[in-house]
Amino acid sequence: MSMTRADVTGITEHESEQVERANESGRTPVVFIHGLWLLPTSWDRWATLFEDAGYTAVKPGWPDDPETVADAKAHPEVFAGKTVGQVADHIDRVVGGLNKKPAVIGHSFGGLLAQIIAGRGLASVTVAIDPAPFRGVLPLPISALKAASPVLTNPANRSKAIPLTYAQFRFAFANAVSEQEAKELYDTYAVPAPGAPLFQAATANLNPWTEVKVDTTNPARGPLLILDGEKDNTVPWAIANASYKRQKRNPGVTEIMKITGRGHALTIDSGWKEVAETALAFVRRFA
């Protein structure tokens, strides 16, 4: 199994190398945070685009992330039990090693994590794409429940790593692309994911001590753009817009944009570049 060894802080050798490279470059870092059922490699094309634009990319994993999709499928147990708080603190430690305050971009639960990091005052500018909801975000559309049902229908899944079947991936991620592209995306990117974050998000509004909370009022949060795919089943517009309404109370620039005709796979499908360039344009305004 190809996994990088972590030091006592939990930061892997590969992550340390990325941080060191970013610091040596003198460029503004852009930290890319993936969500459930994906790996850091899902950001590879984004990283190239941003580096070509003059930034330096850092793609931290969640704790114990395998390096490849093949490894992830062979050893799904490594994902089990990871919580939002554990992942947020891991990203925090990676960001803490950077000499410059980074731009932070996240997708799905990565979009939630990006907002958590921004709420801690650690981001110069943030783009949250199809972000998972946090405490205080109330809408719960039927499609979002269906997308989460492979995990939430069994309480025992909280401590397990859960893969998506192709049909489940097609609904939750790839509903806005062709059948052929959906199958290619599934084979190329989909990996098992921890069940815990979905249970945490589902109960966040009932739990005052939840890890799924964002400091939306911190004036050090910085500028924030929320992007949401028009056809997203997993994070429909109602959820993204409710997140925006909570965030716009912040004194920092807060914007939201709907990406026409796109589903939850908008960061990895054939139209990824449109989304990446939209994010890049926002980052360029502030970093």
Give the predicted meaning of each segment.
Residues N23-V69:
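Short, surface-exposed "cap/lid" segments of acyl-processing enzymes
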Residues V31-W37, G61, H107-S108, D228-G229, ...:
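The conserved beta1-alpha1 loop
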Residues G85-P102:
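Conserved acidic catalytic loop of the alpha/beta-hydrolase fold
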Residues I105-G110, A114:
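Gly/Ala-rich beta-loop-alpha elbow adjacent to hydrolase catalytic centers
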Residues A123-S159, F199-L206:
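Flexible "cap/lid" loop of the alpha/beta hydrolase fold
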Residues A220, I226-D228, D232:
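Short beta-strand/loop motif that positions the catalytic acidic residue
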Residues V253-A287:
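Catalytic active-site module of serine/aspartate enzymes centered on a nucleophile-bearing elbow/loop
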